[in-house]
């Protein structure tokens, strides 16, 4: 490969049975003409930051903790598609996205979120740097869905444009609650109103990226 520099973590292992380490790599540096740069481990709250920890926290719904680890919120990107439009009937319209294949999703529940419209098929250029605030539900929507299909629905605050067919990025900031089945649409509407206020309080705080 004729590499000039080889950058590895301090616990780097390679080769058969992972017997090679940083010292092994350095022992070949002069022969093959490269320099070894070792990156120290990063820690957060006395825990080493790693892809394993990040995946674990996401799978447990702790999306807030991974923001400083990733340097950004964990996000989902996809095209806005037509749904059942039940949200609109209760006064809380949502932008629906299809799940991405091989994407790690947090557990079913409601999340405070930020939204960016990346590009549009019908309205021309969008500003990908403009951020909207909202609330996102991930799950099978048990109150109105009897098929158990995974859904991703986002209510964008103070937003009434038609964005069907456009590509959006949804950034998950914090889990508000787990998914729950309600006895009626009125109960769902009341809970969503509370969730929206909770999301607004969460999003009013500064999102820390260390």
Stretch-by-stretch model annotation:
Residues 1-93, 183-189, 196:
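Classical nucleotidyltransferase
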Residues 83-210:
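Phosphate/ribose-recognition catalytic cores of enzymes acting on nucleotide-derived substrates
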């Amino acid at each position: 490969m004729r590499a000039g520099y080889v950058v590895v973590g301090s616990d780097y292992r390679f080769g058969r049975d992972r017997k090679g380490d940083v010292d092994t790599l350095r022992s070949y540096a002069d022969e093959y003409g490269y320099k070894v740069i070792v990156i120290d481990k990063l820690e957060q709250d006395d825990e080493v930051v790693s892809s394993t920890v990040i995946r674990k926290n996401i799978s447990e719904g702790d999306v807030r903790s991974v923001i400083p680890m990733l340097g950004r919120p964990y996000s989902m990107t996809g095209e806005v598609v037509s749904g059942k439009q039940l949200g609109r009937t209760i006064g809380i319209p949502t932008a629906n996205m299809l799940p991405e294949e091989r994407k790690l999703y947090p557990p079913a529940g409601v999340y405070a979120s930020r939204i960016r419209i990346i590009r549009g098929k019908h309205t021309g250029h969008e500003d990908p740097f403009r951020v909207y605030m909202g609330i996102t539900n991930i799950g099978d929507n048990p109150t109105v869905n009897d098929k158990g299909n995974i859904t991703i629905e986002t209510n964008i605050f103070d937003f009434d444009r038609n964005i069907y067919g456009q590509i959006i990025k949804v950034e998950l900031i914090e889990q508000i609650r787990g998914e729950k089945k309600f006895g009626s649409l009125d109960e769902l509407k009341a809970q969503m109103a509370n969730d929206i206020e909770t999301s607004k309080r969460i999003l009013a705080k500064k999102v820390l990226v260390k």
